[in-house]
A protein has these predicted regions:
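Intrinsic disorder/low-complexity segments enriched in polar/small residues
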Residues: 3-5, 29, 134-136
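A short alpha-helix capping/helix-coil boundary motif
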Residues: 1-2, 8, 89-92
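Conserved N-terminal/central alpha/beta ligand/cofactor-binding core
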Residues: 24, 30-31, 37-130, 134
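Small-residue (primarily alanine) positions within well-ordered alpha-helices
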Residues: 17, 21-26
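Phosphate-coordination loops involved in phosphoryl transfer and adenosine-cofactor binding
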Residues: 6-8, 125, 137
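Beta1/beta-strand and adjacent pyrophosphate-binding region of the FAD-binding site
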Residues: 3-17, 33
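A short, structure-level motif marking secondary-structure boundaries and short turns
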Residues: 5-7, 20, 95-97
Length: 137
């Protein structure tokens, strides 16, 4: 038996952009679901071994705002991330960028915690295969 559920917003893809968007929308009072084909939120940033966000700051000041800033600050306060400013790029040592280095496992856990706290329905190992407009069956 299929259960019908209504959502104000369905976010397809639970990468960092999708997760941040879903959390922001849910905090504004929308009923939100995230459809994610993988097994966690955060996408490549949480599951690929990637441990840095480039362009995290400019001249020593963090650039992220909103949900992103909250997530990264919480990782830093917990000892699971740190800003590194003016890091030479591997492809051109003369170009320096600011980076946030973090623990991807902690990012996964934090995104899930924030989503659950916001009341988001998480649909892991699920893919969107069709969509329709309107309320017709």
């Amino acid at each position: 038996m299929q259960q019908e559920t209504q959502f104000d917003l369905i976010v397809v893809g639970g990468g960092t952009a999708g997760a941040f968007s879903a959390i922001a929308a849910a905090r504004e009072g929308l009923k939100v679901a995230v459809v994610e084909r993988g097994t966690c939120l955060g996408g490549l940033a949480a599951s690929s071994g990637l441990t840095e966000m480039n362009a995290a700051g400019f001249q020593g000041a963090p650039l992220y705002r909103g949900i992103e800033r909250e997530v990264f600050d919480r990782l830093i306060w917990g000892g699971h991330a740190a800003y590194h400013f003016a890091v030479p790029m591997s492809s051109n040592k003369e170009v320096k960028i600011d980076r946030l280095r973090y623990d991807p496992e902690r990012l996964k856990l934090l995104l899930e915690q924030l989503a659950v706290e916001a009341g988001i329905t998480l649909l892991y190992e699920t893919e969107l295969t069709a969509a329709r407009e309107g309320e017709e069956e």
